[in-house]
Design a protein with these regions (language model features):
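Active-site pocket-lining/capping segments in soluble small-molecule metabolic enzymes
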Residues: 1-89, 109-110, 116-280
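Residues lining hydrophobic/aromatic ligand-binding pockets adjacent to catalytic sites
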Residues: 105
């Protein structure tokens, strides 16, 4: 969990577990990426260094960094680590992305408010991989204050159990999901229909956002997209209805496309460009 050090069972605090997780992934032939905290404070940096040391000695394939100070620590103290800039690095322009590359980053995640056309422009000007969110609740903000504990006594919540449950913030037909110190979209970004379009534009690095989601969500949604990407790459693209049958139960508040198409982040735009409340 990149939002809170007190989150229960957080690998970033249980370093032996983190080391074991990297070993298990490598033994299974998988890559292991270690994310760091989205908004670490100065007192947190010693723990961040310990996390980076485990990542380096375990030969993690990369570390995800959201903070310029953490990027500096990696560059100066753990230069063997490959660096990916995460969504909270606030990459809105090609100049920002280029500066991160100059400091050692090899992969960039543009801020999720950046449209796909703007991402294309940045991508054309910066020599790095660019990561695209394919599915999942879009991270929108992070704070040092825990929203859930603000009303803990009224709601009967305590830490660290509070954020193990799902909490949605509603206003009329808008919804956001609260993770305590983080907030995400209430609807799941869903770019399933647009995979051939993304591949044609040259993107090859994709993300499924699964913070606070169940293991079933992670495995079943991941399997759908692995199948979809393989079909698109083979030239035999066709949407399978069973894909929607898997995805819909995991997205209780529906789908959206985020800000990829320059529209409101809660809308869903189909592959033919037509706006729709939800996929047909």
């Amino acid at each position: 969990n990149i939002y809170c050090r007190l989150y229960e069972r957080n690998f970033l605090e249980a370093l032996d577990d983190l080391r074991t997780a990297v070993e298990i992934l490598h033994a299974a032939g998988k890559k292991a990426y270690v994310s760091t905290y989205a908004a670490p404070l100065t007192p947190d940096l010693d723990q961040v260094r310990r996390v980076l040391e485990v990542a380096a000695t375990s030969q993690a394939d990369a570390v995800e960094v959201h903070n310029l100070g953490v990027l500096r620590i990696v560059a100066q103290e753990f230069p063997s680590l490959r660096v990916h800039m995460g969504a909270f690095a606030n990459v809105y322009t090609d100049l920002t992305a280029r500066k991160f590359v100059e400091l050692g980053a090899t992969r960039i995640t543009p801020n999720y408010e950046v449209s796909l056309s703007e991402t294309d422009l940045i991508n054309s000007r910066v020599p790095a991989e660019f990561e695209i969110l394919l599915h999942g609740k879009m991270p929108l903000g992070v704070s040092e204050s825990c929203f859930l504990l603000t009303g803990a006594s009224t709601l009967g919540l305590s830490c660290p159990e509070a954020c193990q449950e799902e909490y949605f913030l509603h206003y009329e037909d808008w919804e956001l999901k609260s993770l305590g110190k983080g907030v995400t979209s209430g609807r799941d970004v869903c770019m399933l229909e647009h995979i051939p379009h993304l591949l044609a534009r040259g993107y090859r690095v994709f993300r499924i956002e699964t913070i606070s989601e169940t293991p079933a969500y992670q495995s079943e949604v991941g399997r759908v997209y692995a199948d979809a990407i393989a079909r698109a790459e083979s030239g035999q693209w066709r949407i399978k209805e069973e894909w929607w049958d898997v995805l819909r139960p995991h997205s209780s508040h529906g789908f959206c496309n985020g800000f990829y198409f320059g529209r409101s982040g809660r809308l869903y735009i189909s592959a033919n460009g037509a706006g729709a409340t939800q996929p047909a």
